[in-house]
Regions:
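Short acidic loop-to-helix transition motifs that present clustered carboxylates
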Residues: 120, 141-150, 168
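ATP-dependent helicase/translocase motor core
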Residues: 1-110, 119, 123-135, 156-160, ...
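Short, solvent-exposed loop/turn elements at domain surfaces
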Residues: 170-172
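Short beta-strand-centered segment that lines the nucleotide-binding/catalytic pocket of NTP-utilizing
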Residues: 113-115
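Long, compositionally biased, helix-prone stretches
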Residues: 9, 137, 148-151
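Conserved motor-coupling elements within RecA-like helicase/translocase cores
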Residues: 145-161
Length: 175
């Protein structure tokens, strides 16, 4: 049996295959969000109306990458986003900037940041800890909980989970 769900508040409502019936709390949140922001009630509407990007701290390739990802999100082309940059070009900073934008303005609740080596997980965590937001200069980690995925799991309040591909695979396989 297939179950489909249509969120009538989406900018282009359409039936989507779902694997679980939404919980009453989830449906209540959808209604609250629509009432609180009728012009941008869903994350799909929010990513189509993101505020202008503060380009001052960014390099041209980073600006192009962020604009490209946001264009893909707005067009709902989730399988067509790839950031490819040279070593040292600021991929992690670009991803942290994008993470901040979609958490603050895009209606995203959580982000999984995958790396292929443990030392990259540590570097990524440091990049999130050092990132200063463009609007008020606060550190990313003052606003959002960022943590590396461990054997113990994550707190429910974690907004950005950093993990190696191997750890995620192990968690899926065991869980």
């Amino acid at each position: 049996v297939e179950t489909h769900f249509t969120n009538g508040f989406d900018p282009e409502p359409r039936a989507r295959l779902i694997f679980n019936v939404p919980r009453p709390g989830t449906l209540a949140r959808i209604l609250r969000d629509a009432e609180a922001d009728p012009h941008r009630p869903t994350w799909r509407a929010k990513v189509q109306n993101l505020p202008a990007l503060d380009t001052a701290p960014l390099r041209p390739a980073q600006i192009e990458a962020i604009n490209g990802v946001e264009k893909s999100l707005a067009a709902q082309q989730f399988d067509r986003s790839l950031i490819q940059m040279a070593t040292g070009a600021g991929k992690t900073y670009t991803a942290v900037t994008q993470s901040y934008r979609v958490l603050k303005h895009g209606g995203f609740n959580r982000i999984l940041f995958l790396v292929d080596r443990n030392n990259l997980a540590d570097q990524t965590l440091a990049e999130f800890q050092n990132y200063r937001t463009p609007d008020d200069g606060r550190r990313f980690t003052e606003l959002y909980n960022v943590a590396k995925l461990s054997k113990a799991g994550l707190l429910g309040s974690t907004k950005v989970s950093i993990s190696t591909i191997q750890r995620v695979f192990k968690a899926i396989k065991v869980g």
